């Protein structure tokens, strides 16, 4: 197994040979996975203040820049990305999985945790790992993280739903792409949970999803939205495919609308 030092070297090498397109996380860390003794590879992307060109960099300008940086980070909202393939053997997805989201929402703090093997999204330990990562954000910016928005793709959407019920933070917006909520049981039971009664839900579902057929997913989502007492909407694309690349390439407007500024 590759040790951590070797992994970070490989990660940086891959980043440079691709011209920086991977947008590797500014902070890469390992957070505890509940009481299991395991750790989850986590990436954090921080927003940056708009830089003004200066002929000379003085101490006062550096101090002002640092002050602006602190203010931007303290006031930024936080989005958690739940990647797909939650039971795969790749246990370091979190270091890069949130990169696209960070590009879409440069004004936000993006947090991406790694699920893998038995430490999948629908476990108490992984919910605790998400909160541990958010605790790290709070410590890093010296301001609490009280509310978050959640984005998931494929079985990452199970993490969105599970955190909504079990997580410590209040949830504002939820974006669930190519989901199969039936894995968690009856929609009415899940939708009636007390902690589901806040924020918004946006479901993006495709008619050409190769893994989750729309004749099974759409009725579940429809029933869920009928029961939950908050703003809940299904957006269906008959040509929609399963993968993130489709939604990013074809339905960017839906994605941007789902997570409010």
Residue ranges with predicted function:
Residues 9-19:
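Bacterial N-terminal signal peptides
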Residues 22-78, 124, 153-155, 162, ...:
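A domain-start/cap signature at the N-terminus of enzymes
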Residues 72-76, 81-121, 183:
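Short substrate-entry loop that stabilizes the transition state in hydrolases
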Residues 81-87, 138-141, 153, 160, ...:
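Cell-envelope and extracellular/periplasmic
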Residues 84, 202-204, 210-261:
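C-terminal catalytic histidine-bearing segment of alpha/beta-hydrolase fold enzymes
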Residues 121-141:
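Alpha/beta-hydrolase active-site loop
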Residues 140, 146-195:
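Primarily recognizes the serine-hydrolase "nucleophile elbow" in alpha/beta-hydrolase
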Residues 195-201:
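Short, proline-enriched alpha-helix->beta-strand connector loops that line the catalytic pocket
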């Amino acid at each position: 197994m590759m040790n951590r030092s070797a992994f970070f070297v490989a990660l940086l090498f891959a980043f440079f040979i691709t011209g920086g397109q991977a947008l590797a996380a500014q902070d890469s860390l390992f957070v505890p996975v509940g009481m299991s003794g395991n750790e989850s590879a986590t990436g954090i992307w921080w927003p940056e203040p708009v830089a003004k060109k200066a002929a000379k960099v003085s101490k006062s300008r550096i101090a002002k820049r640092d002050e602006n940086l602190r203010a931007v980070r303290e006031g930024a909202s936080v989005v958690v990305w739940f990647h797909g393939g939650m039971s795969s053997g790749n246990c370091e997805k979190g270091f890069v999985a949130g990169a696209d989201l960070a590009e879409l929402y440069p004004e936000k703090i993006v947090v991406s945790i790694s699920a893998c093997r038995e430490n999948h999204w629908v476990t108490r330990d992984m919910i605790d790992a998400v909160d541990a990562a958010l605790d790290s954000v709070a410590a890093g910016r010296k301001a609490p993280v009280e509310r978050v928005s959640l984005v998931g793709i494929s079985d990452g959407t199970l993490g969105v739903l599970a955190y909504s019920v079990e997580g410590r933070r209040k949830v504002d917006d939820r974006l669930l792409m190519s989901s199969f909520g039936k894995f968690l049981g009856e929609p009415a039971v899940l939708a009636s949970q007390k902690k589901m009664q806040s924020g918004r839900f946006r479901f993006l579902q495709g008619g050409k999803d190769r893994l989750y057929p729309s004749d099974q997913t759409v009725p579940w989502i429809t029933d869920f939205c009928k029961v939950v007492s908050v703003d809940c909407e299904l957006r269906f694309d008959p040509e929609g495919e399963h993968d993130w690349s489709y939604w990013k390439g074809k339905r960017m407007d839906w994605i941007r609308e789902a997570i409010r500024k």
